[in-house]
Amino acid sequence: GVIADLAAARQPVIDERGRPETPPAPEGGLAVQLAGIVWTLINRQLLSRDTGGLDVTIVNDIPDGAGLGDEAARGVAFALALLGDGDDLDDAPVRARIAEVCHQAAEMFSPVPPLRARYTAALRGQYDSVSVIDYADGSVTQAPHPQSGDLEFYAITVEQARVDRSAEILRRRRFVEEACRAFGTESLRLLPDASQRVIEWLTAVHKVHGEENTPEIGDAAAWLAFEERETERGLRMARALRARRIDDIWHLIAQSQSGLTGPYGLLGSEAMVQLCIVRGALGARAASAGNVEAVIAGVETRRAPNFTQDLADDGLAVIRLGRGRVAGLADAGR
């Protein structure tokens, strides 16, 4: 069928030099994305092949372009609805598998590069906690949520906030994926001296195959350095949250934002971040770098009314963030 053909077009092929060719970017609207979830669930043997046609209605109160993961929330909700008859939907291994399926479907059928952590947090998170996800081993632990009576968080966005830097995001991700394949590892974090060895590998690739469809050495080194430092910042952030040292998180957020728009080169949110700081935020960072210009900002509760009013006067949309809840099925009988 159509979905199977689209999935086949996304599979990597090997060129005459023995290197994987980059498949075309996914194309298709919401119907294709939802059908892709059905197709992936069937092929992963989570859904019967006898599944018939579907009439889908989606109710969504997440503002478009806010960078709050509405695509992931929609995909997870749809998958849970399809699997609603299962008795084990609350089991961690099952939820981990559903998150993997939803992320895989988004990679194949969504034009927006998905963030795997959003699917994991939606299905395996906990109320009142921040999910700490280790990509090296897939483990998920929880840290105390920083929101309190003295601290609020907001998403700040603007009309037409979506930006299309999908090609740049995919270019960085595919470089890391090719490096992982070259070294036979699922994560560069499992590779000793990863940055140095990957650069040596890339240099050899350039000498043998040329530089076509590969990053320049300087760009690759900057990306790897950012990934390494961002991982360290994530670990330090988790320790600060668990120790309830909230004052320690703001410089980590600032460093992360600086790295995104500097060495990593995903521009688009820096002006909004600076405006939030000027208006009184303790810290702010891109909500979904390269996809939207929205940011997430933390503000002292006593300053929140002036902060939100000033940004509203600037023509921005300001959305107060709660702590959320884990994805689940509502009782249709209520």
Residue ranges and their predicted role:
Residues 1-28, 132-286, 296-334:
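C-terminal nucleotide
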Residues 6, 23-148, 157-159, 280, ...:
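Gly/Ser-rich oxyanion-binding loop with an adjacent helix/lid
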Residues 68, 286-287:
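Short glycine/threonine-rich catalytic loop with a Thr-x-Gly-x-Asp
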Residues 293:
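Catalytic DNA-binding helix-loop module of base-excision-repair DNA glycosylases/AP lyases
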